[in-house]
Every structure is written in C-alpha cells, then in structure tokens.
Amino acid sequence: FEQLLSVPKKGQKVIVNRNCHRSILTGLIISGAEPIWVCPNRIEDWSVWGNIDGGKIEELLKQNPDTSMVWITNPTYEGVVSDIKSISNVCKKYGVPLLVDEAHGCLWNFNKHLPETALKLGADAVVHSLHKTGGSMSQSSMLHIAKDSCLDVSAVEKALKLLHTTSPSLMLLASLD
C-alpha cells in the first residue's frame, strides 16, 4: 500500500476510508498527501463500520475538486462490502482514479457466489493480500492495475522501485504462485 500511495505528490488530496489499513496511513505520510476522510456507514447491531456508497464519495469530490485519487477498503476486515460499482462510476465522472484494498477478497474472482472483484467493477487498481485468504506466506501480496486504468503506470513503477528491495524473498514470491 505504501508503494502505491507514494504516487501522489506532497499536498495532493486523497479520499480514503477512515477504517483503512495502517499501511495506507504510512503511504500517506511517505507521500505527504493530505487525507480526506470518508466515514463508512455504521452497523450498530455489530458495532462495526459498514459500507461506503458512491453518494458519499461524490459529495467529497464536489467539496474537494482537486482530489488526486480515491482509496477504499473492500471488503472490510469484518467482511462488509461497499458499492464499488457506484463509487467507480463517480470516480470516472470526476476523472479520479479509484484504488481498492481488496486484501480479504483475493479469491472472489474464482467463485460466482462471492462478490465481484473491484477490477471487474471499474477500479483502476486493486491490491490483493494473498497471505490473508489466498494461502501464501505472510507479507505477500499482488498489485493489479486495470488495462484501462487512468493511473500513471510509470509513476507506480517508480514508486515500487524506490521502496522495494533489490533482493526479494524468493520464498515469498514462490508462495504467490
């Protein structure tokens, strides 16, 4: 997450859900980006944060037209799914890339009874933490960038090269296979 969030420049605004993973906070600090917090709906019966809909994102984009990207966690740690399709439509309307932390949804693409992956719903990039639900070793994850993404792929590659080791763990890489 830190790698992708080092793409925004200092002072640029990023809409991010308030219950994001701490690595996203690290990425915001490294990049110097300014978070614009979106609070998910609350599920009082469960005492957990719920979903986010496109209306909340559109409201924030209207208030912050200079936003550089939107970052949403979907699903939450508790398994709550947001309306990624409506969020994606709003982001496309405003020309802002949508990035999704789909850490706990890495296997969704392989079962028709599970929610659709954010890439199919229009996200520009998705991070899958295969060590959480995919069976790979801890610390292993994948970044997927959509073919029609509006992200600057060369900037993402530069950020990855800046922050990644030149000696990656072959055991971790093999466990992703």
Label for each model-derived stretch:
Residues 2-177:
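Conserved PLP-enzyme active-site core in the AAT-like
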